[in-house]
Design a protein with these regions (language model features):
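Gly/Ala-rich beta-loop-alpha elbow adjacent to hydrolase catalytic centers
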Residues: 92-97, 101
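Bacterial N-terminal signal peptides
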Residues: 8-17
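Active-site catalytic motif of lipid deacylating hydrolases and related acyltransferases
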Residues: 27-86
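Bacterial N-terminal signal peptides that target proteins for export
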Residues: 1-9
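Flexible "cap/lid" loop of the alpha/beta hydrolase fold
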Residues: 109-156, 183, 187
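Short beta-strand/loop motif that positions the catalytic acidic residue
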Residues: 203-205
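Conserved loop-alpha-helix segment in the C-terminal half of the alpha/beta-hydrolase fold
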Residues: 207-234, 240, 252
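Active-site nucleophile elbow and catalytic-triad environment of alpha/beta-hydrolase enzymes
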Residues: 176-197
């Protein structure tokens, strides 16, 4: 009888060990590659605060510099950086960059998407039309200007008010003067196969966003069943003004999606 108990105990221990091994195999390790995509009227330098935090915490971070000359060029630039990664990655996008990431994120190396005050169109949609669902303060203003060759930019005198109200005047002025003009037709680019339909996603809602209506960001998140994080009082430039909170969301995504 004692022998039978010992055998039973050994069987239980073996079963427990097998169970723990299975869990360990499933648990894996967090994704370490992060690709950051900026939006319209900006460049990659705005990600510096988020970049510093992620790198300090052990992540390998790459920043896409989209030319904004065409939607196809921006998607290609993003895919080019994705291809440089040494494994799976999280794709993070701000503003117009959300549409770019939605199209580029179908790459098999991308295993999750984080939208930061960003557009998130579905197949057959474009961000210009989506923006009409919940018009923003910017869309009702005179701040969007157009060049003779069809590019748009934000009036530097109004940049602080509509894009970066929670930054200092000096920071906003630098962003305004370093902005990359965006080809007007980019906002009308139609999504063919949205990555968020097949991959987990997160949405950072900037509650004081005047460039994209926060209610549109919430609507996008609900439709996509994204994990939603609201950052109270944040402007459209939330990735610049609140880098710690944005980095926390990105790191949460990396921990949630295991290799």
């Amino acid at each position: 009888m004692i022998a039978n108990c010992v055998k039973a105990g050994l069987l239980c221990l073996c079963a427990l060990g097998m169970s723990n091994n299975s869990v360990a195999q499933r648990s894996g390790t967090p994704i370490k590659n992060i690709v950051l995509v900026h939006g319209a009227w900006a460049d990659g330098s705005g990600w510096k605060g988020v970049y510093d935090i992620l790198v300090k915490d052990g992540f390998r971070v790459s920043i896409v510099q989209e030319p904004e000359t065409s939607f196809q060029d921006d998607v290609a630039a993003t895919k080019r950086v994705i291809a440089q990664q040494d494994g799976q990655c999280i794709l993070v996008a701000h503003s117009y960059g959300g549409a770019v990431a939605t199209e580029a994120g179908t790459d098999p190396s991308v295993v999750g998407l984080v939208y930061v005050a960003a557009h998130m169109p579905d197949a057959g949609e474009n961000e210009a039309d989506d923006g009409k669902r919940f018009p923003s303060d910017l869309s009702k203003s005179t701040a969007i200007k157009k060049t003779a060759d069809g590019f748009t930019y934000l009036d530097p005198a109004q940049f602080h008010e509509y894009f970066a109200a929670d930054l200092s005047a000096e920071q906003a002025a630098f962003m305004a003067r370093s902005q990359v003009p965006n080809f007007a037709d980019n906002f009308k680019a139609v999504i063919t196969k949205p990555a968020w339909r097949s991959k987990p996603s997160w949405m950072v809602v900037a509650t004081k966003d005047r460039t994209i209506n926060p209610d549109l960001e919430r609507w996008y998140a609900t439709r996509a069943n994204s994990r939603k994080v609201e950052i109270a009082g944040a402007s459209h430039a939330v990735y610049v003004s609140r880098p710690k909170e944005v980095a926390d969301v990105i790191e949460s995504a990396a921990r949630a999606i295991l290799k």
